C-alpha cells in the first residue's frame, strides 16, 4: 500500500521538476534572468502552459509505452512459467517411473552416490559391479 502512495508522489515530483526545468530552459532561451518575471507576462504564461501540456503528453506517452512493455514482459514470463511447470511435472513423472522400475539395490546405490557427492556411473548400468569393458582395438570391428 505504501508503494502505491509513493509512486504518484514521485510522479508528481518528476512533473514538478520537468516543469521547473522547462520554465528555466524557456527563460534562458528568451534571455531573461528571472523566470518568475517572465511568467507574469500573459503571452509567456501561455507558452509555459503549452510547454507543460507537451510535457504531460510526453510523460503520458512514455507511461503508456512502459505499461505496454511491462504487459508484454509479464505475458512472456507467464508463458515461461507455464512451460517450466509442464516440464517439472514431466520430470516428476519420469522420476516416479524410474523409482518404481529401479531395484532396491539400485536405489541404495543412488542414495549413497547422492550422499558422497560422486556423479552417477554412466558407463555401466546401475547395479552392475563389473568394470567397464575395454575398448575394442582398431581394425577388429565392432564386437557384441
UniProtKB/Swiss-Prot annotation:
Main location: cytoplasm
Region (Leucine-zipper), start-end ranges: 77-98
SUPFAM superfamilies: Delta-sleep-inducing peptide immunoreactive peptide
Protein name: TSC22 domain family protein 1
Gene expressing this chain: TSC22D1
Keywords: Cytoplasm, Mitochondrion, Nucleus, Repressor, Transcription, Transcription regulation
Pfam families cross-referenced by the UniProt entry: TSC22
Coiled coil regions in record: none
Organism: Bathyergus suillus (Cape dune mole rat)
Function statement: Transcriptional repressor. Plays a role in the repression of hematopoietic precursor cell growth. Promotes IL2 deprivation-induced apoptosis in T-lymphocytes, via repression of TSC22D3/GILZ transcription and activation of the caspase cascade. Positively regulates cell death in response to TGFB3 during mammary gland involution.
PROSITE patterns (UniProt xref): TSC22
GO biological process: negative regulation of apoptotic process; negative regulation of hematopoietic stem cell proliferation; positive regulation of apoptotic process; positive regulation of cell population proliferation; positive regulation of programmed cell death; positive regulation of transforming growth factor beta receptor signaling pathway; regulation of transcription by RNA polymerase II
InterPro entries in UniProt: TSC22/Bun, TSC22/BUN_CS
Compartments reported by the entry: Cytoplasm; Nucleus; Mitochondrion
Region of interest called Disordered, as start-end residue ranges on this chain: 109-144
Subunit structure: Forms homodimers. Forms a heterodimer with TSC22D4/THG1. Interacts with histone H1-2. Interacts with GNL3.
